[in-house]
Amino acid sequence: MTTTEKIVPRLKTRYRDEIRQALNEEFHYSNAMQVPGVVKVVVNMGVGDAARDSKLIEGAVRDLATITGQKPEIRKARKSIAQFKLREGMPIGARVTLRGDRMWEFIDRLVTIALPRIRDFRGLSGKQFDGKGNYTFGLNEQSMFHEIDPDSIDRPRGMDITVVTTANTDEEGRVLLRRLGFPFKEN
């Protein structure tokens, strides 16, 4: 019988060994549990056109599942809006919440492979923190992820990615994400 050894994601190892210590030295926390960390990553793909064509949601679900390695949750409209020809209960998006090792591997792939593949990429805006150390940013298309075959894309779909941290302030969150490798623009 072979035993499968569990491989710890390299970014998680780097966080535990180097980044936590560096953050503790920089902000002088009185307790080791106060050092900020990443809780979860939420990847959301809104497909507003799915209200008119229900087949579009299937492509979004397929792309999200390929990118994240997890089956997305289909989000439905909470209330009807006549101007958008939207009825309550219609599928309008897909969402994946990543935690644990999948989260660390996704952040690693995002920072090292996907973001550098964006054309004319000059860094992420440092102003998109929510006041509590969480960071949200949007991507215009899904083709920068190497798991997606560019020839199989039926249409470009953007997505929102939210990185939820335990940081109390935006500055702590910014330092944490910068140490994890997020390329922020220099103001």
UniProtKB/Swiss-Prot annotation:
Top-rank taxon: Bacteria
Which of UniProt's keywords are assigned here?
Ribonucleoprotein, Ribosomal protein, RNA-binding, rRNA-binding, tRNA-binding
The answer to whether UniProt assigns keyword Magnesium to this entry is no
Molecular function (GO) terms for this protein are: rRNA binding; structural constituent of ribosome; tRNA binding
Keyword tRNA-binding among UniProt keywords:
yes
Stored Pfam families: Ribosomal_L5, Ribosomal_L5_C
Q: Which residues form the signal peptide?
A: none
According to its UniProt entry, the protein's GO biological process terms are: translation
Q: Name one GO cellular component term.
A: ribosome
Extract the InterPro entries matched here: Ribosomal_uL5, Ribosomal_uL5_bac-type, Ribosomal_uL5_C, Ribosomal_uL5_dom_sf, Ribosomal_uL5_N
Purpose of the protein: This is one of the proteins that bind and probably mediate the attachment of the 5S RNA into the large ribosomal subunit, where it forms part of the central protuberance. In the 70S ribosome it contacts protein S13 of the 30S subunit (bridge B1b), connecting the 2 subunits; this bridge is implicated in subunit movement. Contacts the P site tRNA; the 5S rRNA and some of its associated proteins might help stabilize positioning of ribosome-bound tRNAs.
Q: Which family does it belong to?
A: Belongs to the universal ribosomal protein uL5 family.
The subunit field of the Swiss-Prot or TrEMBL record says: Part of the 50S ribosomal subunit; part of the 5S rRNA/L5/L18/L25 subcomplex. Contacts the 5S rRNA and the P site tRNA. Forms a bridge to the 30S subunit in the 70S ribosome.
Name used for this protein in its record:
Large ribosomal subunit protein uL5
Species whose genome carries this gene: Saccharopolyspora erythraea (strain ATCC 11635 / DSM 40517 / JCM 4748 / NBRC 13426 / NCIMB 8594 / NRRL 2338)
